[in-house]
């Protein structure tokens, strides 16, 4: 679902409406400006980071791809500022992914997704691979950023307590179909679909 929305996978049918535009069948060049405003945090912090790139280069990659900065100095300033926002430091910039814990790697992935200040971030099970002790830290980091910048999240998860904590609105999917959607409180107070009732 997440990879189809962001067009890593091609949709077989239907529409993907983003900012009033159907992006489901845009060509790669047409997707470029869309991608600047739509980023993704992947489920697996181990597989989603390039092992041959430093943390600095991983976070700088979107800035370079979208020609955001005019100089290497500006790139570094944005990278270091984002590292600080996700709870890391400039000293981490020269290291490689294998030198970090799972929670730190996911922070690097989050920094990469947020460095462009996108309108929408797709969070594909972003905490499921992390220790329980780290999960709340990562979720709070995302919430703090959202409150400061107004970013929207599409948070895909199976942990219903976490879903309730992070969501204003909830959609329930069953066998690839959206079977119910409502605001968070209504879903929990008055679930309508049998699958939703079973989850709760």
Residue ranges and their predicted role:
Residues 126, 130, 134-200:
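P-loop NTP-binding/switch modules centered on Walker-like glycine-rich loops
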Residues 14-22, 34:
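Conserved ABC transporter NBD signature motif
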């Amino acid at each position: 679902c997440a990879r189809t929305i962001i067009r890593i996978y091609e949709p077989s049918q239907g529409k993907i409406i983003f900012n009033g535009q159907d992006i489901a069948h845009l060509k790669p060049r047409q997707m470029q400006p869309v991608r600047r405003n739509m980023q993704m945090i992947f489920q697996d912090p181990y597989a989603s980071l390039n092992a041959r790139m430093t943390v600095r280069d991983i976070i700088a990659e979107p800035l370079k791809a979208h020609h955001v900065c005019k100089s290497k100095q500006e790139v570094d300033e944005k990278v270091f500022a984002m590292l600080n926002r996700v709870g890391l430091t400039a000293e981490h910039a020269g290291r490689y992914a294998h030198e970090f814990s799972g929670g730190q790697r996911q922070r690097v992935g989050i920094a990469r997704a947020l460095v462009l200040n996108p309108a929408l971030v797709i969070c594909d099970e972003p905490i499921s691979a992390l220790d329980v002790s780290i999960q709340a830290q990562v979720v709070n980091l995302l919430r703090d950023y959202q409150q400061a910048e107004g970013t929207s999240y599409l948070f895909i998860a199976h942990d219903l307590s976490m879903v309730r904590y992070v969501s204003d609105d909830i959609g329930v999917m069953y066998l690839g179909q959206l079977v119910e959607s409502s605001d968070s409180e209504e879903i929990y107070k008055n679930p309508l679909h049998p699958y939703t009732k079973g989850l709760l």
